[in-house]
């Protein structure tokens, strides 16, 4: 991906990001805090019913660092070959959504989905009809079969409504929405050496070694007036898929400000 990246119990796209940078965001998993004084119940950060959001999206959400709640589906229905290499679904061949509470009963959602060309218009139509905005449509790789696109989306408001819209849109693809949680095969690479070179600890995502490195600047979503948690498009992604013999296919994307693009 050439722009900001929305990319996680089993590791999800968000869980892989928190492991090496736990100190950058405070983990919170509150649902409802009750204050008994005077018989008044005060809802805290968890006044969004995340279980209801999971039911609407068709998959339990994982609670991550910074009060981010995520869901992921792998494109296990596709056999993708890029530059002669069979791509693992762990190389961002997926659909994902990250939610973050912004106000009582409200949330911001950022995500993306890998699509075949024939799926793009019908998914876009379903998202727009449900009030979810498309923020980017571009390619992550250039020599793949079948030809693929990556669609990024954004929404704010009632998270249950947003989740229903996402489920409706993803149902227009070939993604098996009822897929079980993926089992992570071991990464057949010298992960310790790569950790030293990258300067962070990678995480096994479906047999792919992934690094999510938060940007140093605070990234503000000016429409909802919040600083984005680094799990929501505020990190650089590097992926290493083992090929055997100590070799790897490498892919990823950089989150950058405009003045950083040419130097990088």
Which residue ranges define each predicted feature?
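Secretory targeting and sorting signals
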Residues: 2-43
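Long, contiguous binding/interaction regions
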Residues: 3-4, 43-147, 154-263
